[in-house]
Structure formats: structure tokens, C-alpha cells
């Protein structure tokens, strides 16, 4: 299977699939469990260090290309004219009409359909996947490990992430679309499997840096309910003339970040065919260069360590932050002393990246909450520093802080 993967991928990242003997594994991974070790296959893949920022940058690039973006506005229901979908009703009271509506609500696809038509049949199987982040200790692997979990045979992985390890995953049916988090049972399972894979680690609950959970919007098939791991990961784009389709509507079922570009292309092509529109431009980006930041980009007065963090987190988009600093040198200062976030990041996130809450800022823009840093004890100080920079009232600062603490419980 991996050789087929390599052939289809064309080895875009270098390296090649090859087998490793048990002896080689013991030498390369001395902390790896010894019993039952027969060998392994090695392959090369890409890693998105900050998937949250990838999504944000896709959104801002779309806006720069002419799209509209309404943060914090929910589609309450679809508007029907007889049997055809003709528009949407928004949570702020607006009614928007269009010749074609695309329901790309992820794991909320069914909820939107059922709010619009109570008899709508579910199209998704939703499962929860949870992960924990642990410190990567001396002697632990610098490359990812993908094995079968000892307790249940599920796919299980440890993936290096900076100085940490992402450990996952679980696969559990989840029916509540608005609330999800890693349960204690899942955390215990992940800790136990990590310790079995790396027996010398002896990880404890106190070692957990953070948890992450998400909901997979998997396509529901007819027939009896099957085991979570057996549900197909293939996506579907359902148009008006497809089975389960409705006039005026495209439903996106399934999909994930890995395939977001091809899924978007497939959806847009279907929409253009429905609307009778011909493509005038190609979005192929093989020749687009995304230059990395160099020391020549560092504004005068910005600490080199802080510059390097901005370069790592934002890539070429960091130039927008540096432009702000060149206009106002005070934005090069740390937001709070002792944490590597500068004031310019906050201004950039709120003025150019649609950040509206503290959770937006620190979990999906500045990425502070994914760092193994002592920010947990300083949430109030961080909230007040942001409030001062953005001229929040005391009441707004209190409300933002309270909302952030609630959001952190789901991390």
C-alpha cells in the first residue's frame, strides 16, 4: 500500500518507502517497546505545523480575492420557495438569496437541514477524534510513529510537534454537534497507549500540555450501524440531481483539511455546471513562490527571538505584522513580559484576520495556547493586556475572559 502511495504522490517531499528491520528500529528508537517488534515501513509525508493558521489564511486570501466573510454569524435555516432552496436566514436577521446555496457546514450539515425541514433524513455519521500533547523527552523519536494500539488494534500515532508529541487518536460516535472535548476515558486510553509504546516515558496526567478533539463528518450509509473505524472516509458532493439532492442546493459531506483543495475544486466545478458558468481562470499554484522571511525583514527594535517566532508561526504573512511595527514601534513590545507574543500580532489578528475573541487570538491566530509555556496562569493578565490595546471596557474585558476560560475547557 505504501509503495502505491509513493507512486501516486510522486515523492513530492523526498525520501522513499523502505522497510526497516527490528534491529534497525531498536538502534534508531532505543526507547521503543521491544516485545513483539518485527520491523516497520518508512515513508515521508508533509506536516502542517499550524493547521488553524492555514484555515485563517485561506479565509483572508478569499476575502482579498473578493469574497465576503461574516464572523460569528450563523445560518439559522434555508429559505424555500416551494421545493427549491433559494436563500438563507442568518442569525442577525438578514435574509440572503442566491441562485445556488452550498452547505459546507461540516459536521453541522444535518443540523442545518433539519432546522430547515424537520423531516430531513440524516446524511452523516459523526465520530469524535481526540488527541493529547505531551513533552518530547530526550531519546524519544524525532519522526512520527504509526502503529496499532495494543488495547483495541486501532491506528495509533505519535507525531513530533516542535518540542512536543501529538498522541492520537480515538474514534467514537458523537451525536452532540455543539459540544465536544476529550473525555477522561479517552485521555486515559491515549496516555496508556503512549506509555506502552514508550515504556521509559512514564507519562502522567500532569504531563499533558493540552488536549484537542474534533468531529469527523463521515458519510452515512444505509443499513445497520457499523463500527466507527469501518465508516468510509470518502467524501460526497451532492448536487440537485443526485440521490438525496434538492433543487438549488449543494451539500458537502465528509472531507478533511488534507483534501480541502481538491474538494473545493470538485464543488466549484459542480456549481459552475449547475449555473451554466464557464471557468475563466485556473487556480493551479505550482509556480507560486511563497518566500520565507529572512533577517533582512526584521524591523529595527524587534528582538531576534520574537522575530523568529513570528517567522515560524506566520511565514510570509509575518511581513504584514512587521509593516505595522514600522508604523508604530511600540507594537514590537511583548504583550506581557515573559511570553513571546508581541502587540503587533494582536493588532494584525483583529484588523486583518477577523479575530473577535480571546480564543480566536490565542488559539487560532497567535497560536499561544499550543505552546508549552506558562500562559495558563496568566489568562487574566493576557485579557487585560489585549483589552488595553484594543480599548475594551472593563465589562467587555471581563466577558471576554470568562468566555475564553469556557472555551479552554473544550481544548
Placement of each model-derived feature along the sequence:
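General small-molecule cofactor/ligand-binding pocket signal
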Residues: 68-70, 209
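Dinucleotide-binding Rossmann-like beta1-alpha1 core, especially the glycine-rich loop
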Residues: 1-28, 156, 307, 316
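C-terminal catalytic lobe of FAD-dependent flavoproteins
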Residues: 17, 53, 61, 114, ...
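Core beta-strand elements of the Rossmann-like FAD/NAD(P) dinucleotide-binding domain
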Residues: 91-100
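Helix-loop-beta segment of a Rossmann-like dinucleotide-binding subdomain
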Residues: 6-10, 26-65, 87, 170-178, ...
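C-terminal amphipathic alpha-helical interaction region
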Residues: 372-375, 391-411
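Glycine-rich, N-terminal phosphate-binding loop of Rossmann-like dinucleotide-binding domains
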Residues: 105-106
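A conserved short coil-to-beta-strand element within the FAD-binding core of flavoproteins
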Residues: 71-86
Amino acid at each position: 500500500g505504501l509503495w502505491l502511495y509513493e507512486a501516486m504522490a510522486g515523492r513530492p517531499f523526498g525520501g522513499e518507502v523502505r522497510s526497516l528491520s527490528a534491529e534497525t528500529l531498536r538502534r534508531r528508537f532505543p526507547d521503543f517497546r521491544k516485545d513483539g517488534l518485527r520491523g516497520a515501513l518508512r515513508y515521508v509525508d508533509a506536516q502542517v505545523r499550524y493547521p488553524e493558521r492555514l484555515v485563517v489564511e485561506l479565509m483572508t486570501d478569499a476575502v482579498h480575492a473578493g469574497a465576503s466573510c461574516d464572523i460569528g454569524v450563523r445560518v439559522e435555516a434555508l429559505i424555500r420557495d416551494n421545493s427549491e432552496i433559494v436563500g438563507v436566514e442568518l442569525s442577525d436577521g438578514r435574509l440572503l438569496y442566491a441562485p445556488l446555496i452550498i452547505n459546507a457546514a461540516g459536521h453541522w450539515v444535518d443540523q442545518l437541514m433539519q432546522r430547515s425541514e424537520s423531516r430531513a433524513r440524516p446524511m452523516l455519521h459523526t465520530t469524535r477524534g481526540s488527541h493529547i500533547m505531551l513533552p518530547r523527552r530526550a531519546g524519544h523519536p524525532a519522526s512520527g510513529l504509526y502503529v496499532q494500539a495494543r488495547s483495541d488494534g486501532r491506528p495509533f500515532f505519535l507525531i513530533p510537534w516542535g518540542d512536543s508529541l501529538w498522541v492520537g487518536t480515538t474514534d467514537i460516535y458523537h451525536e452532540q454537534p455543539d459540544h465536544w472535548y476529550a473525555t477522561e476515558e479517552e485521555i486515559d486510553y491515549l496516555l496508556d497507549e503512549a506509555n506502552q509504546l514508550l515504556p521509559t516515558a512514564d507519562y502522567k496526567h500532569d504531563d499533558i500540555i493540552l488536549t484537542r478533539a474534533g468531529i469527523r463528518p463521515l458519510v452515512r450509509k444505509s443499513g445497520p450501524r457499523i463500527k466507527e473505524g469501518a465508516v468510509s472516509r470518502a467524501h460526497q458532493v451532492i448536487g440537485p440531481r443526485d440521490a438525496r439532492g434538492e433543487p438549488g442546493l449543494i451539500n458537502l459531506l465528509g472531507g478533511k483539511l488534507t483534501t480541502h483543495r481538491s474538494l473545493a475544486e470538485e464543488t466549484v466545478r459542480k456549481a459552475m455546471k449547475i449555473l451554466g458558468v464557464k471557468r475563466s481562470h485556473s487556480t493551479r499554484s505550482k509556480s507560486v513562490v511563497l518566500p520565507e522571511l529572512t533577517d533582512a525583514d526584521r524591523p529595527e527594535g524587534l528582538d531576534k527571538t520574537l522575530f523568529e517566532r513570528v517567522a515560524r508561526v506566520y511565514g510570509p504573512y509575518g511581513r504584514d505584522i512587521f509593516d505595522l511595527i514600522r508604523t508604530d514601534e511600540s507594537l514590537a513590545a511583548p504583550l506581557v513580559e515573559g511570553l513571546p507574543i508581541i502587540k503587533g500580532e494582536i493588532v494584525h489578528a483583529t484588523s486583518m484576520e477577523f479575530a473577535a475573541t480571546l480564543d480566536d487570538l490565542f488559539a487560532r491566530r497567535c497560536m499561544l495556547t499550543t505552546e508549552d509555556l506558562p500562559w495558563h496562569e496568566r489568562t487574566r493578565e493576557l485579557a487585560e493586556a489585549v483589552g488595553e490595546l484594543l480599548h475594551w471596557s472593563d465589562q467587555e474585558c471581563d466577558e471576554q475572559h470568562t468566555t475564553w476560560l469556557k472555551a479552554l475547557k473544550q481544548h
